[in-house]
Amino acid sequence: LARVACAGEVDGEVVDLRTVLDKDCNLNIITASDEEGLKVIRHTASHVLAQAVKKLFPDAKITIGPAIEDGFYYDFDHAPFSREDLDNLEAEMKKIIKEGHELKRFTLPREEAIKFMQERNEPYKVELIEELPEGEEISFYDQGGFVDLCAGPHLMTTKGVKAFKLTSSSMAYWRGNSDKARLQRIYGTAFNKKEELKEYLEKLEDAKRRDHNKLGREMGLFTTVDVIGQGLPLFTPKGTKMIMKLQRWIEDLEDKEWGY
């Protein structure tokens, strides 16, 4: 059980395996096959990504990096990342994972935490801490000298991230607010086994092949322009002809089959 444990659940709260139990409690062990265990793996993978970004792009500012359905993401204040950048980041992440850095949790009083992140020149982390109540103990995680503001929980070491892939990058706004800073979001996914990752990536590729956006462009049915926006397709004569045929077919069905 110790080999597959990712975290613990103490009285309903998911915690690190390093958590000291100093009183009677209800304890459950969370493994990599559990949904919560997969979240912990992916959360740790996001921290590994952030560490890799800071190594290869020292001027990048870190913001937030949660586990999400099917994977994780991390937002950075930096210029857009290319596919080559993502490949280089993957290689750096593999180094970090192989090095097996321990993820060590520590806390600081709120004012010390603000000063700590100011000294590291991480303004987004400072903003997050400043919104927390006075007197709050602020938790951080250190892995090989990379430190991130985080409530956790995390794996014991970076070696626990066994199978991952950076899937894409896109633009995002800080706090999801278009009036705030533009950020670059890197998406990734992680699984406990390489076979699970391979199966997931094959499903992604299959979905891309059947993507109506991709197929419609390749068939010359529509296009988009940045001035109008990517969410509003402009149909070509060929695409317009197809729509008219579909409309007539539906009208015939309504009249002949459905009676209205």
What residue ranges belong to the model's regions?
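Auxiliary tRNA-acceptor-end handling modules of aminoacyl-tRNA synthetases
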Residues: 4, 19-40, 61-65, 73-260
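Short alpha-helix capping/helix-loop boundary micro-motifs
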Residues: 11-17
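Metal-associated gating/positioning segment near the N- to mid-region
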Residues: 51, 55
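NTP-dependent nucleotidyl-transfer catalytic core
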Residues: 69
